[in-house]
Amino acid sequence: MNNIIPDRKIMPPLNGMAEFDIMKPHVEIMPNGMKLNVIDVGTEDVIRFDLVIGSGQINQSVPLQAMFANRMLREGTRSMTSALIAEKLDYYGAWLDLSSSVNCGFVTLYSLGKYFDTTIAIVADMVKDAVFPERELQVVVDANKQQYLVNAQRVDVMSRKEINRVLFGRNHPLGKFAEAEDYDRIDTCLLKDFYRKYYHSGNCTLYVSGRVTGGVLDSIRKHFGQEEWGCVSPVKAVALPEPCPEGRKRVFLEKADAMQCSLKMGLFFPERGHEDYHDLRVMTTLLGGYFGSRLMSNIREDKGYTYGIAAGMVSYPGATLMLSLIHISELTRLQLISYA
């Protein structure tokens, strides 16, 4: 028994980092010009398929346009209702995720390989033939607006938005955020306009990973790679402006009924291509990126101020931030700043 249970008083030996290879995708240009990136790895019969749209929030004409154009893809096509789409994906054990970012939109499908031809056909119909029905749009907008109103009262959301405003500037795309009234301005015309401009074979890239068989590749080529689809036209590149920091070093947001404080500290870091990026990433991890990090052992374990403290790097197009964040009680807020 003593040989099985380790002596917790003795630190385990330190070992060097094992060498490993990062697998690079095989790239195929399909007949319609779309790029397909393939990573064939794993033994389980599971496939992840990603369609990445090369346009996002920086391309929208009004707030929330990119998000809802993406979100509404699953709400109906000319041949399937939203209920039928959900029922079919559920029947075949598939999972679908729709999301958008500053400069991209994403359609992600997880599927068993044996049903992949069926499930990717559903996704292809959603992407190529979305209709943006009025009734479903209103339901989706109302639900998202309600979630926004709830989140807007959370101190962590308030601090996250404010630190972006201070670092980037309130008129910068990364410092501006949707307001409640922006949800009321969304209509099908706006979404169809964004969909028509950016959801086409000339502005999308495909990624597939898992146990990628010849049949999986044939299904992708059949549903996405033969002919051009959508209103193919050149998409003008949009560059983010330079950040315009406000210069304030300490910002306080008052919320009288809050039970906790959310404290965020941040600054600009070198971007991914910089020679010091990886060293700084390791340093940030040592500071607050894992359970035994400096912030965790000092503020949580030693001082007992909180269960939740961390530091990490956040990458945006053209900018990288290093952020430290914590939730604490008001009584310990001022003490904590000096310790961090």
Regions found by a protein language model. Give the residues of each.
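His/Glu-rich zincin catalytic helix
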Residues: 1-87, 108, 192-298
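Cationic, low-complexity basic patches in intrinsically disordered or flexible, solvent-exposed regions
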Residues: 336
